[in-house]
């Protein structure tokens, strides 16, 4: 009933405003009472027309379909425009029926109505805020004091929502902004207190509990710098996601999330050439191996955005394929998807799949990737990473697949691990396949991805949750990192750029010290490193390097048209000799013998297996 009465009440109020404004305009325009009386009689005869015209125009301008508690400049423009149009319409009708009043009366009426109607809406907004404050007055005696970093549009919208819905939980003390012209000024009734350099002092002076970073369009490097400043305080850190993460482009408190390690990387979102990517994926049947894995599942999601005809999700583990299928059914219910449980080493099965579905694009993400684990079973690494790639690549060529993209790793460069060496051989095989096939074969090489299964971040989080210690193999160990979506998007972009035979190298930015990463994660979890949570150095594991390389120094890279993608200059190999060596190594089962054969195939492979003897 309330939802029917409220609009009716607003219409009645507007009617009163229209009549009052018309009468006021008469007495403002004419000082002579006799003249005023004459036009007053004419006005009274026109009041039904004036009221009807104004209400219809207000309805057309949706003045009765707005939530006035959020009223701003857009609503003010609508009120002004509606009253101008209403005045012109009323004047036109008056001329038509030959009862026109002086033109100044229409102008005065419109001007007064802007004040009356605008004032009534402002009253609704103030009243709504007052009621909301009254509701929360006694809910919480202790409110979290908040600093908002970013006195821009996002910060203003966030403050309005905090004042509207979270007034009993958070109290915004002020804004932080690097624009010094804003300092000392007020935005949405809240003062801009200083720049990022003042955060630590202000947090201490005002006893701030939480710092919210509300700068969704700012580059990742700047966000990283601000986070590092905020980490010096004891405040809880939350952040609005980047613009590319906000689906509707609106700002909401519900979108606030804790600052995570990904934010500390300071990496900017990838700029895809969507036209080029869509050109080779749109309307195509796309097969993805390892589709249930961290990278494979994200490639599935990114490909789905490009409107393929059909997605073939190939994986050995039924649970992971089931999970990605469930996600895709929710996100893309109309897209054709086929879950396929298969081992990439099973040539007969893979051939049957490609023969039946006839994929045009293949992303080969299936692989054994855990470095220490593969040191203990090198023969299994060879069969999965080398034989699996050989089977998929040869079958793709046989069925004339248009584009074949293999996911590789920085560990393939001057490898010290079995896993890295097997991936280097897989790269070599894919390159050779390109020379004797109509299929465009390419490999894409990148470093560690944050949050992938078995990676260091999930391990650290588990260790922190258990109270520590957090284990780091070496205090000086460094790794390249990027986020899973970033890696997957660049893989798609590399596929669009492929001419055939390239080994693409992704720009991983600067390497990150794992020890620093552990400290940051402990701090972000609300603990003090080596006080609340111990960091324990355990020593290098089998096959590990202190530093990873994305390309060998003697070979170098070439630039491409994309700033984050390069082409590695890699020496050619003899296909027949490589085929023979692969056949030979597949016959070997004893670990040390497999390693010796790997060294023969990849002379730059320097095994680091001392830890196996301990």
Give residue ranges: language-model regions.
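Strand-loop microenvironment adjacent to phosphate/nucleotide-handling motifs in alpha/beta enzyme folds
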Residues: 271, 276-280, 428, 432-448, ...
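Conserved Rossmann-fold NAD(P)-dependent oxidoreductase catalytic core, especially the SDR/UDP-sugar
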Residues: 233, 248-249, 364, 368-427, ...
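Flexible, Lys/Arg-rich cytosolic regulatory linkers and terminal tails that connect or flank
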Residues: 223-285, 397
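N-terminal Rossmann NAD(P)H-binding glycine-rich loop of SDR-like oxidoreductase domains
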Residues: 286-304
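Proline-aspartate-enriched helix->loop->beta-strand connector
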Residues: 203, 207-209, 308-309, 354-363, ...
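Signature of alpha-helical transmembrane segments in polytopic membrane proteins
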Residues: 1-141, 170, 183, 232, ...
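Conserved Rossmann-fold cofactor-binding substructure of NAD(P)-dependent oxidoreductases
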Residues: 341-361
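A solvent-exposed beta-alpha-beta segment
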Residues: 9-10, 19, 23, 34, ...
């Amino acid at each position: 009933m309330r939802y029917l009465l409220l609009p009716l009440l607003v219409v009645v109020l507007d009617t009163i405003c229209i009549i009052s404004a018309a009468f006021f305009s008469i007495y403002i325009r004419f000082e002579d009472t006799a003249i005023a009386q004459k036009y007053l009689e004419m006005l009274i005869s026109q009041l039904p027309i004036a009221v009807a015209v104004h209400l219809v125009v207000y309805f057309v301008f949706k003045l009765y379909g707005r939530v006035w508690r959020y009223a701003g400049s857009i609503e003010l423009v609508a009120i002004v425009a509606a009253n101008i149009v209403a005045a012109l319409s009323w004047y036109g009708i008056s001329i038509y029926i030959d009862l026109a009043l002086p033109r100044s009366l229409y102008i005065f009426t419109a001007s007064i109505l802007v004040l009356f109607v605008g004032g009534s809406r402002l009253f609704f907004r103030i009243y709504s805020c007052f009621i909301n404050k009254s509701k929360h007055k006694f809910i919480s005696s202790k409110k979290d004091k908040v600093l908002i970093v970013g006195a821009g549009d996002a910060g203003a919208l966030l403050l309005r929502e905090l004042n509207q819905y979270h007034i009993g939980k958070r109290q915004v003390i002020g804004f932080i902004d690097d624009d010094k012209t804003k300092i000392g000024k007020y935005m949405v009734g809240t003062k801009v207190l200083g720049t990022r350099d003042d955060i630590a002092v202000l947090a201490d002076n005002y006893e701030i509990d939480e710092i919210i970073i509300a700068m969704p369009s700012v580059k990742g490097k700047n966000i990283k710098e601000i986070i590092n400043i905020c980490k010096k305080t004891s405040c809880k850190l939350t952040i609005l996601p980047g613009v590319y993460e906000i689906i509707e482009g609106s700002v909401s408190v519900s979108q606030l999330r804790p600052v995570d390690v990904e934010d500390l990387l300071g990496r900017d979102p990838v700029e895809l050439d969507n036209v080029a990517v869509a050109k080779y994926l749109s309307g195509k049947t796309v097969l993805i191996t390892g589709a249930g894995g961290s990278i494979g599942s994200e490639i599935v999601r990114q490909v789905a955005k490009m409107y393929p005809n059909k997605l073939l999700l190939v994986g050995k583990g039924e649970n992971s394929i089931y999970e990605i299928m469930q996600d895709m059914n929710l996100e893309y219910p109309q897209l054709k998807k086929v879950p396929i449980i298969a081992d990439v080493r099973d040539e007969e099965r893979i051939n049957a799949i490609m023969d039946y579905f006839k994929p045009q694009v293949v992303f080969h993400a299936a692989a054994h990737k855990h470095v220490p684990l593969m040191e203990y079973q090198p023969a299994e690494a060879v069969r999965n990473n080398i034989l699996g790639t050989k089977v998929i690549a040869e079958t793709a060529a046989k069925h004339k697949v248009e584009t074949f993209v293999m996911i590789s790793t920085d560990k393939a460069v001057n490898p010290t691990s079995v896993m890295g060496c097997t991936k280097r051989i897989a790269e070599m095989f894919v390159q050779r396949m390109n020379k004797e096939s109509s299929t465009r074969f390419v490999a894409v090489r990148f470093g560690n991805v944050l949050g992938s299964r078995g990676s260091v971040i999930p391990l650290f989080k588990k260790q922190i949750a258990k109270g520590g210690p957090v284990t780091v193999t070496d205090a000086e160990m460094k790794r390249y990192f990027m986020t899973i979506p970033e890696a997957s998007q660049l893989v798609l972009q590399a596929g669009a750029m492929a001419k055939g035979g390239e080994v693409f190298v992704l720009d991983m930015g600067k390497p990150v010290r794992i020890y620093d990463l552990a400290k940051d994660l402990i701090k972000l979890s609300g603990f003090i490193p080596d006080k609340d949570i111990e960091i324990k150095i355990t020593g290098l594991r089998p096959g590990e390097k202190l530093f990873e390389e994305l390309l060998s120094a003697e070979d170098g890279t070439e630039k491409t048209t994309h700033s984050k993608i390069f082409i590695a200059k890699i020496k050619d190999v003899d296909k027949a000799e490589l085929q023979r060596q692969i056949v030979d190594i597949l016959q070997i089962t004893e670990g040390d013998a497999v390693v010796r054969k790997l060294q023969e195939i990849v002379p730059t492979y320097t095994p680091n297996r001392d830890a196996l003897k301990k």
